[in-house]
Amino acid sequence: MQLKNLDTGVALPLPDDLLWSDEHAWSPAVANASYLITGSLLIQSATRKSGRPITLVGAPDMAWVTRAAVEQLRAWAAIPVGGSTGRFELTFTDGRVFTVAFRHQEVAIEAEPVLGIPARSGNDFYRLTLRF
């Protein structure tokens, strides 16, 4: 799996064992129901064109990344979505590719040291959660 910054072309490899936790908790169909003044039910529905959430979660004993990778991800997550910035290409090992942006309305990145103590080196490992 890899995440590529579409503005700079820089790619960051991610562990293949990150789990897409909300992969099947989303539907492209969206609807709104309301009652008219006459008492009739009005249902408006459409198909979403974008905005599918992707949450990647690492299990406690796998999908670790280095502190250096966490720092790169945090720097990328700090980029606001603009004309050509803040968009990334997420490529899964099975070939699926998504254009994503970090979810700034939520905590975009959670990283916890594997050893439970503050990491000192760029090579120390972290458990990771990413929200796009």
Model-derived regions, located:
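Extracellular/virion structural assembly segments
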Residues: M1-F132
